[in-house]
């Protein structure tokens, strides 16, 4: 008996809605990354993008536990000497909560072409409204 290997044309994609309000950022991001990769499907193939689309709403209400709001930093470097810029997550979540969530998920996905394809299937919204009602997304209850 041969192992089943999914082909990109055969993959059926579903749409899911995840409400991130009051839930820890890392826990929500890890489950979203798993769905984007397709690890929740029995036909998971590591070298094929077989994941589903995920819509994350209420990104501005995501929680960070402990002192992470002040101690955790978003770091950017300009590649010039002394070009490191650090921003505390309190400021990042206040200005661009979508970016903070996308960064958390992006770092959990594979690095390379496949990871960039998977990240395109992630739609993050600041509030409770989104533009994807036509796709009839299912509400996804997270494990924790």
UniProtKB/Swiss-Prot annotation:
| Pfam families to which the protein is assigned, alphabetical | Ribosomal_L13 (PF00572)
**Has UniProt tagged this entry with the keyword Ribonucleoprotein?**
yes
Give GO BP annotations, semicolon-separated.
negative regulation of translation; translation
Example GO molecular function: mRNA binding
Keywords annotated in UniProt: Ribonucleoprotein, Ribosomal protein
The record's section on InterPro entries has: Ribosomal_uL13, Ribosomal_uL13_bac-type, Ribosomal_uL13_CS, Ribosomal_uL13_sf
Matching SUPFAM superfamilies, A to Z? Ribosomal protein L13
Q: Which Gene3D superfamilies match?
A: Ribosomal protein L13
Instruction: Decide whether keyword Ribosomal protein is in the record.
Output: yes
What's a single GO CC term here?
A: cytosolic large ribosomal subunit
Q: How does it assemble?
A: Part of the 50S ribosomal subunit.
Q: Which HAMAP family match?
A: Ribosomal_uL13 (MF_01366)
Q: Name the job this protein performs.
A: This protein is one of the early assembly proteins of the 50S ribosomal subunit, although it is not seen to bind rRNA by itself. It is important during the early stages of 50S assembly.
Task: Name the family the entry cites.
Answer: Belongs to the universal ribosomal protein uL13 family.
Know the name of this protein? Large ribosomal subunit protein uL13
Q: Which organism is it from?
A: Clostridium botulinum (strain Eklund 17B / Type B)
Underlying gene: rplM
């Amino acid at each position: 008996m041969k192992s089943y290997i999914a082909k990109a044309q055969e993959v059926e994609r579903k749409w899911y809605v995840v409400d991130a309000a009051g839930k820890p950022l890392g826990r929500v991001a890890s489950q979203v990354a798993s769905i984007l990769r397709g690890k929740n499907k029995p036909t998971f193939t590591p070298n094929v993008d077989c994941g589903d689309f995920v819509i994350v709403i209420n990104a501005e209400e995501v929680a960070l536990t402990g002192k992470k709001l002040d101690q955790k930093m978003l770091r950017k470097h300009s590649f010039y000497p002394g070009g490191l810029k650090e921003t505390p997550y309190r400021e990042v979540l206040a200005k661009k909560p979508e970016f903070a969530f996308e960064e958390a998920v992006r770092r959990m996905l594979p690095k390379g072409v496949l990871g960039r394809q998977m990240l395109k299937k992630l739609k993050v919204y600041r509030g409770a409204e989104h533009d994807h009602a036509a796709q009839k997304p299912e509400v996804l209850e997270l494990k924790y």
